[in-house]
Each structure stands twice: as C-alpha cells, then as structure tokens.
Amino acid sequence: MDKPTILVVNPNTSEEMTAAIDRIAWEAAGASANVVTRRSLHGPHTIEGPLDAVLGAAGMLEVVGAYSYSFDAVVVACFGDPGVEALRLLVRVPVIGIGAASFTQAAFLSQRFAIVTPTVGTSERYATVTEAMGIAPQFVGTYQTPLAVADFESADPAVVNTLVFHAQQAAKDGADCLLFGCAGIADQIREIEERVGVLCIPSVAAGVTQAIACLRHRCAPLVGGPFRRVNSKPLEGFNSLVRHYEGRA
C-alpha cells in the first residue's frame, strides 16, 4: 500500500520558515507518510494579527488549489490556524491546523500546559480556545515574549535565550508541557526542552501526526455536515481554485 501524502502549507511567504517547517514535518512523518511542503506565494512575510491571517489564508488557498498532484491530508502550518475552515470546504480530505493539534496533544500528554508566544500572541484568544475545547482547567496561561515572528528565522542565541526565559517562567508556574505559538519556533525546540526540563511539543509535528492519525480512521471524502457546500455557483478569477471549488478535483 502506498504511503499517504500530506500537503503541509505555510500561509506566510518566508522561505527560511518554510524550510524549518519542512524539516520538522518530515521528522514527524517518519516512515508513515510522504510530506510535501509549500508556502504562500502572495501575502505577508510573516503572520502577525488578523489582517495578516486573512491575507495569508488567501495565498494558502491559491497554493493548495494550484497543487496538481494528489494528496491525502493538508496541514496548515500556522499556530493561529488561519483558513482551516475554508480549506475544509475547498478540499475533500482532512485539514489539520497545527494550533488545535498542539492543544489536543498537550491535553493528552500533560497535567498542565502553557504557551510561549511571539509578541502578537494574546492570552485572551488562547484562553477562549482552551475553554471551547474543554481543556481550560489544564491551561496555565500564555507567556508573551517581545520577539517578532521574523526573529525566529535568526540563529541569534538571544532569540533562544528569550524563549527559554519565558519557558522557565511557565514551568515555575506549574506547566509540565509547553507549546509555542508560531510554526517558526521549530529548530529551537529541542534545545529549549533540554534547558527547561519539561516536554516541549513542536506544533508542526503535532499537526503532521494528527493528520496521520486521521487518515488511519477515515479514507472516504469529507462531503457532509460542515463540509457540505450549500449552493453551487460560478467562481470569477481565482483560476487555481476552480477545479476544487466546482468539485472536479
């Protein structure tokens, strides 16, 4: 039996971040799946806030629509999970957001977990997410660093030191598992885990392993319920999306 193919899409346009995402994704997939990693060709260099998220999601939809080979699942490689619901309507395969996947794994693997984020991470948003998922009692909180998302492209030791400092604060407050609110925090995670001494979950790895788990349970196209398109209609422009949008993919 052929291995499934997981399409991992970075909604931003950063080549450096996409390369890091690809490394983590392949490591997580192991022998269980093939990985194809792509990035948005149009949109912001990094995603920081709602406007960037919408622009990045639009670019991501174009990338998925233009990909001409078959794939069995899509992983959205941004912790805010932009465009996940739209992609679930566009394609007929499981679509996994790395943010939701990370929360799920943390809930299973720890008693209490926390999130270390770049400066754009908001405690209110993540508190709302954990409440909606029913895991709020396990959530220690959000530890916001002064780092921009683009800083994670750097090999500057000061970046890792800053992440470690905030991770240590979270551990002191009772977290025995840490998430990181950016897919770009990838290559640094093992060092952080060693220095802090608690489990650190790479968000991209969580997304890929969740996709593999979904494929083991569900192979039929996802067409009903929340995946049902209400009315067929023509699509003007967005040529790369037409075959998926009209159900011909």
Where would I find each of the regions flagged by the language model?
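Short, glycine-/small-residue-rich phosphate/pyrophosphate-handling segment
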Residues: 16, 107-145, 158, 213-249
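N-terminal beta1-alpha1 ligand-phosphate binding loop
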Residues: 4-28
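Glycine/small-residue-rich loop that forms an oxyanion/phosphate-binding "nest" at active or ligand-binding sites
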Residues: 57-111, 115
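Short, well-structured alpha-helical segments in soluble
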Residues: 54-70, 160-174
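Periplasmic-binding protein-like
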Residues: 8, 71-78, 174-183
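Active-site rim beta-loop-alpha module in soluble metabolic enzymes
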Residues: 127-183, 188
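N-terminal beta-loop-helix "entrance" segment that forms/cooperates
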Residues: 37-61, 150-155
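C-terminal alpha-helical cap/extension of soluble enzyme domains
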Residues: 24, 30, 36-43, 50-52, ...
